[in-house]
Amino acid sequence: MDWAEVQQRQEAGTLHEQAGRCMDCGVPFCHQGCPLGNLIPEWNDLVWRDRWDEASERMHATNNFPEFTGRVCPAPCESSCVLGINQEPVTIKQVEYAIGEKAFDDDLIKPYVPQRLVGKTIAVVGSGPAGLAAAQQLTQGGFTVAVYERDDRIGGLLRYGIPDFKLEKSVLERRLEIMRQEGTKFRPGVEIGTDITWDALRRRYDAVIVATGATRPRELAIPGRELAGIHYAMDFLVRANHLVAEDHVPDPIDARGKHVIVLGGGDTGSDCIGTALRQGAASVTSLAIGRKPPVDRADEEPWPMMPRVFEVSTSHEEGGERMYLASTVEFVGQDGRVTGLRVAETEYREDGSRGPVAGTEKVLPADLILLALGFTGNESRELTEQLPVALDSRDNVARDETYMTAVDGVFSCGDAGRGQSLVVWAIAEGRACAAHVERHLTGQTRLPEPVTPSERAIDLSL
């Protein structure tokens, strides 16, 4: 099976042309589309002038991990590009990807070791993009930082949630090695709440950052849910990533020779499609309850908002069928195993609700059904049992405008506090949280604060 990355670097001439299309707008809306506030016109201009070392410096000024976002970010900056009003936007993501790769190729990425230590210790719990960003910012600022991860390897979502064909793990490892050289300590295989209690961790460190993600999957409570062969998407992807890493997996979920149905049309669902196809699935069908998105931007989602449009990922290009307006009715099974999914057409009612249309039911054959329906908050009961940390109405870790929770010195960032979101938002929150931790411990900060905890994507509804 070929798990190699499918994304390729644009030809030098094409990159030069795309970077040159950037108009260096007086008000660059691409900044507003990016929660990191990336200096996009600046590094576009530098690429156009073949000054790649300076382009890398300007890119890393706002983004700890451009090699990650250049691969997995949906590029809301491109939706906000002024050129996109009447033509195709600049391919910002491709330029970002190329800068990141050339920087590593040319050995421009060097560890930044602080000249002096502050004398304060910080524990970061969770090693996804938010936790890693916070850890690197604080380590470079002179703090002694330890990152705890319950899995056997560091990386969180980047390690086991995203397939290699989108993000090869060698890309993650080379960045982690830079962080090790800077002084960040990694503690994989340690589950806070079990191996070390949360209250003991708080006593041990001057500050604690909760960056555990939003890992509780959304359920689908319809008849037949107890049948074997129905799995959460992340359970499938995590096992697949372990297999690609040549780990022993005692209970693999294998799509080989099976008719696979993926419920959910987002990035996680797309990753399931590509993974199932590589495993040799007999067929893959993706179902979404909503309408098929339009090809072009809808009037109610004007520029510079990121519109909901019909997208074709590399996984979709590889095969499978996509169905819309499909309401799930019942999991069908025999002898305790799933054999199909009963679906019906979806209707939108005048009151805004939606549901199945009577008389339109049919059964789709399925040996494996994957639930890629999103996530509903933090799954760690130990956190709230061992510390007086509050959860908000969506079961995310509640925090104030300084990212601090109800417990003094305990902060929360990324999906753990924001809820399910994008890698780019997680990095932005990790950077901002680090600034507030520094201010809390020293009374001042030199670190950037790209986003507030309550900030969201561009909203023109007000």
Located regions from the model:
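FAD-site-proximal beta/loop scaffold in flavoenzymes
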Residues: 226-257, 349-420
